[in-house]
Amino acid sequence: MSTVTPALRRRLLRVSAPYPSEQPVYTAQPVDTTRPTALTRPVDATHPWIVARLRCPVCAEPLAAATDIRALRCPRRHSFDLARQGYVNLLTGRAPHVGDTAEMVAARADFLAAGHYDVISSALAETAATWLATATGDAGPPTASGATAAGFGAYPLVVDAGAGTGWHLAAVLAALPDAVGLALDVAKPALRRAARAHPRAAAALADTWQRLPLADRSTAVLLNVFAPRNGVEFRRVLHPAGALLVVTPTDAHLAELVDVLGLLRVDPAKTDRVADSLAGHFTPEQTTVHTARLTLGRAEVATLVGMGPSAWHTDPGRLAAAIDALPAPVTVTASVRLTVWRPR
């Protein structure tokens, strides 16, 4: 059963409401990260709590908000535009793929808002809150990235690598009232939603296979949900006292749909492959399995399948016909493995 309470659900839906697209551009200035202050406006990439942690994806120099245009610039004059919808484009070169379409993103947003994956959001939020509560506290002055020598500063940064619409990131931030968040993705339609997923979340267009546009040791918690893992970069940006939370499917995930729809099965070696991708950089700290029974309509089944790798490996026409033949509603198992990885 989901542990997302009705109050938390209302809070998540409320913070997902859009903000005005035109927001004042802040000029980056030194910020005292040891003394929390009230949030006076929704966070975006120009906010001091975020921009202090960002780095130029070209030269790795610090970034600051430009005063003449809506952009971030580094001392070497590399410039990165802020979209009207609130995210910053920190992509260099062509994206490896364009990600989900606007229609796919809209369907995914509706699916998540219906609570079908609350089992994942809740597990991430509870694990992140527990982890930060027990991690080392502040010690010493903060670095330029906002972190202290043995702690995370007053505004711990939560990064979601492959964030999609930012739904899971928003759930984690709702459980961490002093944290700020950054959603990274290559899909612009998803980032338009991620940029307004939570008042304390910013969003950036970035390829997580490349160097991440973040300072060393800048991140307290790094989320990775059904997304590729860049072990080298994850280790570089994660604070030594931080945690990487990785969510992967178990072999029971969507098992009721695999044969009837001809979906890809979860690789039996999935756990080993995840460990290999992080080997030498992280050590597994704990693993928990989270399961929920979903009751879905046919359209929701189509959305769910479209959120996974089978969407790229199954004939669309045959898949649509198989979904139409399903009895409605459909009962499906969601089963995921959440592993906490510690930096070595």
Predicted regions and their residues:
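Conserved Class I S-adenosyl-L-methionine
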Residues: 51-52, 289-344
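A short glycine-rich, Lys/Arg-flanked "PGG" loop and its adjoining helix->strand segment in the class I
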Residues: 231-245
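Conserved class I S-adenosyl-L-methionine
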Residues: 243-275
